[in-house]
Amino acid sequence: MDNMLLAFLLTLFAGLATGVGSLIAFMAKTTNTKFLSFALGLSAGVMIYVSMVDIFFKAKDALTAYLGDTQGYWLTVIAFFGGMLLIGFIDRFIPKYTNPHEVKKVEDMKKPHQPLRDPDLMKMGLFTALALAIHNFPEGIATFVSTLHDPSIGLAIAIAVAIHNIPEGIAVSVPIYYATGDRKKAFKYSFLSGLAEPLGAIVAILILMPFLNDLMFGIIFAMVAGIMVFISLDELLPAARKYDEAHMSMYGVISGMALMAVSLLLLA
C-alpha cells in the first residue's frame, strides 16, 4: 500500500509539471536557453540509461522466468518495440502545426497583443492540450508501474518526465493565450492536460493491478523502456539540440546517464 501511494504521488508530481510550465511562462522574463538545453538533455540521459541498462533487463528477467529463455527474450524485444509503436501511434494524433512538443519561449507570453477571438485558433489550442493529455496517459502508467516495482527507478522516471513536461506546459499555454488573451484559461488547460498522468495511474490501479503477474509486469516494463527511449529520441534530444549552446545538451545527456548510473550502483 505504501508503494502504491508513493507511485501515485510521483505520477501526480510528474503530471503537475505541465502547470508549472505555465507558471514559469507567466513569471520568467526570458528563456534561459542554456539551462533548458541542459535540462532536456539530462532528462533524455536519465530515460535512455535507465531504460536500456535496467528496465529492459528487469523485463527480460521476468519474462524468461515465466516463459523460458527463448520465448521470454523474444517477447521482451517485441514488447520493447511495441512500446515505441504505441507512443509513435499516439504522436500521430498531434498535427505538426499544433505539436505541443515544440518548445516555446516564455517571451511569447509577454508580447502585448489583442486576443484574436478566432474559434479555429481556440479549437487548435484546445486540441493541443487534448493531444498532450493523450500523450501523457501512457507516461502516467509507465511512471506508476515502474515505481510500484522499484521506487528508485520510479523516482528517476518521474523526475525525467516532469522536466520534459515543463516546456510542454508552456507550449500548451501559448496558443490558448493568443486565442483568448486570458492567462488563467491558458494555465487551466495546461494544468488539466497534465492530469492525464495521474489518470493513467488510476487506470493502472483499477485495471492492471489484478492481472499484474510476472508475465504482465514483464510486458509492461519492456513497453515502458520502449516508450522512454522513443520520447528521448523523438522529443527531448531534438528540443535540446534546437536551443543548444556550447554543447549543453550533450553535457546534459552525459550528466543524466552518469547520475542514473551512480544511483543504480548505490542502490544495488
Swiss-Prot record:
Species lineage: Bacteria, Bacillati, Bacillota, Bacilli, Bacillales
Membrane topology of this protein: Multi-pass membrane protein
Species of the source: Oceanobacillus iheyensis (strain DSM 14371 / CIP 107618 / JCM 11309 / KCTC 3954 / HTE831)
NCBIfam families (alphabetical): PRK04201.1
Subcellular location: Cell membrane
Keyword Transmembrane helix: yes
Residues where Fe(2+) binds: 136, 139, 165, 168, 197
InterPro entries named among the record's database cross-references: ZIP, Zn_transptr_ZupT
Assigned GO CC terms: plasma membrane
Encoding gene per record: zupT
Source taxon at top rank: Bacteria
Protein's name according to its UniProt entry: Zinc transporter ZupT
Binding site for Zn(2+): 139, 164, 168
